[in-house]
Amino acid sequence: MSAPATSPSAPTRPLLAIETSCDDTACAILAWDGTILAEGVLSQTDHAILGGVVPEIAARAHLDALPALVAEVLKKASLTLADIDTFAGTTGPGLIGGLIVGSSYAKGLAMALHRPFVAVNHIEAHILTPRLPSLGADLHFPYLTMLVSGGHCQCVSVEETGRYVRLGGTIDDAAGEAFDKVAKMLGLSWPGGPALEKLATEGRDDAYPLPRPLKGREGCDFSFSGLKTAVSRLIDTQDPTGSRDALPRQFAADVAASFQRAVADVMADRAEHALALSPNATALVVAGGVAANKTLRHALEQVAANHGIPFFAPPLRLCTDNAVMVAWAALERLHAGETPNEIDTAARPRWPLSERTPATPEHVS
């Protein structure tokens, strides 16, 4: 069976990517040079009333949403599936149900059209996002990335495409997870990070002397469980019943601001240590969902300024999960001369950056 003919007006070698690692269903099409031809994201709302992401519900929602979303993105780009040169999908790390749904959908399209499939590491996609040409950043290897999201918190030296040195990571909670849990303690809506940041604008960030775990210590690891516990005990002084309905607004705002400042201080300290270990770093980058937090951005921007290097952060829409970053990560690999066809790779909830591609099904651990 021969592959369908492409339309004469199709841009050179467009790549379609799918992202379903958590609760956002996303699809994007990029041209070979990284130009964004079209993109779309559907955020699931069912989890809000449940106070967090339910993996089974998320996976089912991805399955329901993908056909229409892919069709919509193709229409925006004035393309058909036959015009797509390569398909890509997030294959890990993340929630296994969603990963299987999204990567299998992309693989199915690739197989039906006799096109290659690129298995993309979700963390790698976040790390490479600031190099997207349309962002206009003059970002060159090597650079240091502080990856801060709900599921991940890592400090990574980005040597080149496919070569990453993990300098440190969280030993307990990720920063985004801590944001969500503290927001829940304060009775805020889910997702907690944006709600907490908004409330913090009404408070004083020096109102409560919260701990800065691991600050000043050697290494680049993070720890946020102790900070989270300190916040819980502080809130209990005002609300011993745990109802969270009776918290004074100003108290809650001061707690939010103090917590946010503590996290930013820890991240800045860890970045300082990481830069000391990476004297050749050309820039400091922050990426991941929590990178949308303005206080965190400002703290890391100041660290970069202290070291005389530029600071880069993706626009807010590319900090949270999206398919543009997945498509760009796949293109970065293709630009580097790789010719992957990873149709047999298996989705997996854990996928260290040190492993080039996830294991085949019989070798998944």
From Swiss-Prot:
Q: Where does Fe cation bind?
A: H122, H126, D321
Q: What InterPro entries does the record point to?
A: ATPase_NBD, Gcp-like_dom, KAE1/TsaD, Peptidase_M22_CS, TsaD
What are the UniProt keywords, alphabetically? Acyltransferase, Cytoplasm, Iron, Metal-binding, Transferase, tRNA processing
- Entry binding sites for substrate: L147, V148, S149, G150, G151, D180, G193, N293
Name its GO BP terms in alphabetical order.
tRNA threonylcarbamoyladenosine modification
Main localisation, per the record?
cytoplasm
Q: Which Gene Ontology cellular-component terms appear in the entry?
A: cytoplasm
Which CDD domains does the record match to this protein? ASKHA_NBD_TsaD_bac
Q: Which PROSITE patterns match?
A: GLYCOPROTEASE
Segments for region (Disordered): 340-365
This enzyme catalyses: L-threonylcarbamoyladenylate + adenosine(37) in tRNA = N(6)-L-threonylcarbamoyladenosine(37) in tRNA + AMP + H(+)
- Obligatory cofactor(s): Fe(2+)
Which domain of life does the protein's organism represent? Bacteria
Q: Per UniProt, what is one GO molecular function of this protein?
A: N(6)-L-threonylcarbamoyladenine synthase activity
Q: How is the cofactor bound?
A: Binds 1 Fe(2+) ion per subunit.
UniProt entry tagged with the keyword RNA-binding: no
Q: What is its EC number?
A: 2.3.1.234
Location(s), subcellular: Cytoplasm
Spell out the SUPFAM superfamilies in the cross-references.
Answer: Actin-like ATPase domain (SSF53067)
- From the UniProt record, list the coiled-coil ranges: none
Q: What does this protein do?
A: Required for the formation of a threonylcarbamoyl group on adenosine at position 37 (t(6)A37) in tRNAs that read codons beginning with adenine. Is involved in the transfer of the threonylcarbamoyl moiety of threonylcarbamoyl-AMP (TC-AMP) to the N6 group of A37, together with TsaE and TsaB. TsaD likely plays a direct catalytic role in this reaction.
- Which family does the record claim for this protein? Belongs to the KAE1 / TsaD family.
Quote the PANTHER family the UniProt record gives: TRNA N6-ADENOSINE THREONYLCARBAMOYLTRANSFERASE (PTHR11735), TRNA N6-ADENOSINE THREONYLCARBAMOYLTRANSFERASE, MITOCHONDRIAL (PTHR11735:SF6)
Q: What is this protein called?
A: tRNA N6-adenosine threonylcarbamoyltransferase
Source organism (scientific name): Gluconobacter oxydans (strain 621H)
